[in-house]
């Protein structure tokens, strides 16, 4: 072959290679574009929210009215309304109205009523209205208004209100309302905190001043690092503040259990304020709520027939944790008593109904478990119950002793119930083996004597109650219970200096640290707060158990809260879910509690944790642990508390939540006894978040089945509606909290729980109706393009050029019996194309017909280019 022939041969070869590579790139672009389109079209899982009107600001007092004007320009609160669209990225809030735009950035608003003043500071809350859709990906709370769409990527809140306009720049506004009055006294206790914190100036990019450098030298290494991380100008610190910072214990030693931190407490309290439908207890139809017929029975103290309040209740469960089908009956034990009885009337009764019977009126009362000669000195509080191997019922409960002027000396106790069961009902035959199990050990858990001899009984809260039995697969039994920490990690002022108790970044921790130091009352509460969720192991004697071993707490709430009650554990799959009811009022942030009471009218919540094993370590659900939050004021008929979760048969990712409704002693009006509430479903998501579902039952339903759902029990937040969550006269009624007497519920806003037909985000990719895109390339009916070149029936000549024995003579390309002569020049390109196609196999969303078309075009172009090269070679040879 001459030199010129070689040049022409190479030119033809390079042309063919370039053609094939170009075709491959074109096909790849087409596939990638399609895959990106599918990826970007993922369902974000955010549910629509049904809102009427009501605006809410995350401050001490909120009162809103239609046509009210509020606005600001650097603002941490936000309101959005009809047809408004928010598309911010990392936004703390946005306020908009009907076709109105808000550009405000830091507003310290105060909303006042006739003759009342409210000073809300640092609003982070948000409220929204009808039919809003939120598309936030990482969002702490987001609710929007009529047909409003929010597309924020990291959004802390959004709030909406009809006809509200926002447009001022750094404005301390006041809005008058003729219908509601609200006064907050907390400002006297917290204003100095804000003033002190305001002295902590932020650093800038300038050279540190001499004062800054001098103060940094006064701080120890860890304290200086925390101040710098918080971007605080050390020059603004006083000598007293420097001295306090140097006392902080920054140790990162491993904790023995999980912690509910000060940051978690804030998250729980703010979740109540935001009324996020992900956590908020559903609204119930107040007119459908009935007193429990079975609560009319012989009272344990008086021995006479009486109507009783019903409070904490729990089912008899089988060893797996499901509600027991006990010889055809479902059994429930409940605390009950005559309302407004001096010194209390709190005892436990056995209730029963046919298993699976959802009719609230069919429940019957087998009577007081410990007879009708009880007194108010020795009372029984809540616990749990399990079926023993011999068919008896093992009851675990709280024995409360108030003799000798004791202030609720609580002890964990047990007893064995022998029942007579027939077609006519259930009767208590005998109660055996009653005895005290545990009184605290002083080391892991506080004893009553430690509490009684403490420095401040008035503000301290002693807890050793609510034992919940858990049976492991090997038959071992454990009790999980509410307690306070013992000397192992005891309550003290030192806990305020324990950095691990704060739970936030250095900026949050330092701010909270000085907040507690500068507020005498909060500091006192923080030094006393030592709530705990404890655990102990029982021996193998089911009917007469003793304590075998006591362990460190599963969860402690040092410095943050003094009470986490109604503990219970639900095993779902291979995970253990630990739940507890709590009140923000038992925490050490009174300003946060005041905010909850003012805006919602209640401060109750249910918290939850998850672990791979019973002994932990537990991780909080939803980051802060919040699972449920109060929805209505505490004195409404539909106010709920004492939440208890049970597993749902056939649904390993759901729990049924039970509670009681209407606070005792006729809090919601004369004749409205505390009663069992409708139950509802909470979804447990794979990412350790939870979602309240729009599924409610009749009152007192403990077993979810196909007949359980009753949408008539669901209500709305609308005064005068047929299914209103409030009875006539309840709107605006003040709640009398023994130490706090104020108007409440001024920031209530409608919310709507998620409908199961609108799956939460994790459910989307595994929904059979929405197949994941990788299924396309492996579908036999849609062969991928690489099938053509590797088809045995295709007599492609590439085998010849790669054979070492094959010469590179041009004889073969001109043989008419081998029309695929371009084999030699496309050898390298063909190999590249084949490898590239193979790499595309896992691409998502590939359009098969598009791929085949592009492949065919690429082959034609390659053949054409090769033919040109061949013709060039032939022509040159002929010449």
Curated annotation (Swiss-Prot):
Name the coiled-coil region(s): none
Residue sites binding Ca(2+) per the record: 460, 491, 528, 530, 562
Motif LPXTG sorting signal, chain ranges? 841-845
Q: Which InterPro entries match?
A: Glyco_hydro_68 (IPR003469), Glyco_hydro_beta-prop_sf (IPR023296), KxYKxGKxW (IPR022263), LPXTG_anchor (IPR019931)
Q: Which Gene3D superfamilies match?
A: Glycosyl hydrolase domain, family 43
Task: Give positions of region: Disordered.
Answer: 66-213, 743-830
Q: Which SUPFAM superfamilies match?
A: Arabinanase/levansucrase/invertase
Q: Where is the composition biased (Polar residues)?
A: 66-180, 189-213, 754-821
What does the record note about activity as a function of pH? Answer: Optimum pH is 5.4. Displays 50% of the optimal activity between pH values 4.0 and 6.2. A pH above 7 leads to a complete inhibition of the enzyme.
Cellular compartments annotated: Secreted, Cell wall
Residues of the signal sequence?
Answer: 1-37
Family label:
Belongs to the glycosyl hydrolase 68 family.
Query: What is the protein's name according to its record?
Result: Levansucrase
Organism, by scientific name, is: Fructilactobacillus sanfranciscensis (Lactobacillus sanfranciscensis)
């Amino acid at each position: 072959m001459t030199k010129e022939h070689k040049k022409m041969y190479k030119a033809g070869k390079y042309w063919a290679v370039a053609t094939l590579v170009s075709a491959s790139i074109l096909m790849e672009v087409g596939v990638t574009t399609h895959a990106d389109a599918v990826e970007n079209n993922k369902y974000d899982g955010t549910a629509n929210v049904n809102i009427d009107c009501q605006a809410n600001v995350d401050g001490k007092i909120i009162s809103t009215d239609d046509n009210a004007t509020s606005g600001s320009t650097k603002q941490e609160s936000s309101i959005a309304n009809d047809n408004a669209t928010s598309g911010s990225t990392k936004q703390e809030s946005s306020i908009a109205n009907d076709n109105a735009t808000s550009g405000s950035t830091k507003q310290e608003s105060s909303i006042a009523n006739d003759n009342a003043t409210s000073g809300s500071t640092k609003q982070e809350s948000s409220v929204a209205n009808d039919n809003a859709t939120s598309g936030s990906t990482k969002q702490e709370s987001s609710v929007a208004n009529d047909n409003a769409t929010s597309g924020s990527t990291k959004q802390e809140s959004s709030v909406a209100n009809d006809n509200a306009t926002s447009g001022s720049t750094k404005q301390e506004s006041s809005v008058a309302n003729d219908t509601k009055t609200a006064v907050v006294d907390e400002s006297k206790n917290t204003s100095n905190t804000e003033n002190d914190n305001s002295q902590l100036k932020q650093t800038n990019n300038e050279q540190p001043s001499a004062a800054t450098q001098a103060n940094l030298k006064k701080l120890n290494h860890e304290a200086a690092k925390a101040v710098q991380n918080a971007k605080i100008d050390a020059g603004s610190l006083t000598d007293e503040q420097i001295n306090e910072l140097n006392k902080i214990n920054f140790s990162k030693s491993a904790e023995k259990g999980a912690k509910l931190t000060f940051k978690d407490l804030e998250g729980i309290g703010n979740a109540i304020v935001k009324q996020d439908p992900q956590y908020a207890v559903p609204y119930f139809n107040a007119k459908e709520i009935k007193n429990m017929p079975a609560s009319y029975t012989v009272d344990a103290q008086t021995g006479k027939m009486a109507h009783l309040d019903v409070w904490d209740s729990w089912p008899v469960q089988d060893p797996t944790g499901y509600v027991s089908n006990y010889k055809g009956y479902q059994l429930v034990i409940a605390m009950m008593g005559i309302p407004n009885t001096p010194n209390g009337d709190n005892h436990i009764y056995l209730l029963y109904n046919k298993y699976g019977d959802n009719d609230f009126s069919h429940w019957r009362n087998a009577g007081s478990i410990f007879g009708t000669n009880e007194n108010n000195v020795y009372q029984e509080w809540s616990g749990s119950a399990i079926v023993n191997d011999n068919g008896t019922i093992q009851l675990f409960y709280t024995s409360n002793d108030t003799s000798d002027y004791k202030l609720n000396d609580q002890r964990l106790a047990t007893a064995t119930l022998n029942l007579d069961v027939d077609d006519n009902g259930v009767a208590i035959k005998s109660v055996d083996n009653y005895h005290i199990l545990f009184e605290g050990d002083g080391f892991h858990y506080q004893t009553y004597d430690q509490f009684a001899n403490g420095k401040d009984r008035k503000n301290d809260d002693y807890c050793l109650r609510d034992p919940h039995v858990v049976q492991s697969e090997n038959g071992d039994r454990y009790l999980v219970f509410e307690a306070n920490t013992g000397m192992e990690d005891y309550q003290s002022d030192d806990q305020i200096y324990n950095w691990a108790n704060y739970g936030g970044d250095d900026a949050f921790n330092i701010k909270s640290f000085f907040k507690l130091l500068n507020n005498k009352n909060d500091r006192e509460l923080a030094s006393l707060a030592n709530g705990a969720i404890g655990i102990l192991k029982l021996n193998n004697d089911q009917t007469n158990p003793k304590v075998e071993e006591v362990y460190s707490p599963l969860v402690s709430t040092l410095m943050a809260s003094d009470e986490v009650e109604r503990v219970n554990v639900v095993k779902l799959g291979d995970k253990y879910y630990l739940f507890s009811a709590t009140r923000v009022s038992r925490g050490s942030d009174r300003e946060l509690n005041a905010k909850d009471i003012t805006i919602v009218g209640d401060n109750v919540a249910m918290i939850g944790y998850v672990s791979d094993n019973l002994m932990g370590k537990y991780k909080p659900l939803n980051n802060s642990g919040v699972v449920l939050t109060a929805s209505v004021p505490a004195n409404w008929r539909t106010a709920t508390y004492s939440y208890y979760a049970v597993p749902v048969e056939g649904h390993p990712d759901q729990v049924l939540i039970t509670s009681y409704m209407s606070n005792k002693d006729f809090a919601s009006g004369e004749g409205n006894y505390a009663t069992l509430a409708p139950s509802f479903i909470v979804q447990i998501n794979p990412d350790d978040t939870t979602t309240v579902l729009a599924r409610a039952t009749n009152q007192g339903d403990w077993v979810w089945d196909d007949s359980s759902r009753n949408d008539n029990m669901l209500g709305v937040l609308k005064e005068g509606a047929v299914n209103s969550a409030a009875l006539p006269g309840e709107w605006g009624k003040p709640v009398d909290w023994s130490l706090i007497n104020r108007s409440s519920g001024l920031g209530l806003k409608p919310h709507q729980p998620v409908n199961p037909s609108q799956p939460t985000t994790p459910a989307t990719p595994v929904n059979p109706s929405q197949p994941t895109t990788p299924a396309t390339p492996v579908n036999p009916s849609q062969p991928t393009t690489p099938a053509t070149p590797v088809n045995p029936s295709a007599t492609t000549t590439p085998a010849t050029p790669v054979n070492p024995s094959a010469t590179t003579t041009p004889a073969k390309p001109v043989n008419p019996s081998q029309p695929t002569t371009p084999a030699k020049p496309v050898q390298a390109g063909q190999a590249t194309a084949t490898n590239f196609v193979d790499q595309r196999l896992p691409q998502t969303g590939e359009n098969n017909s598009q791929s085949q078309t592009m492949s065919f075009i690429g082959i034609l172009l390659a053949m054409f280019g090769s033919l040109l090269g061949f013709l060039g070679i032939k022509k040159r040879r002929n010449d």
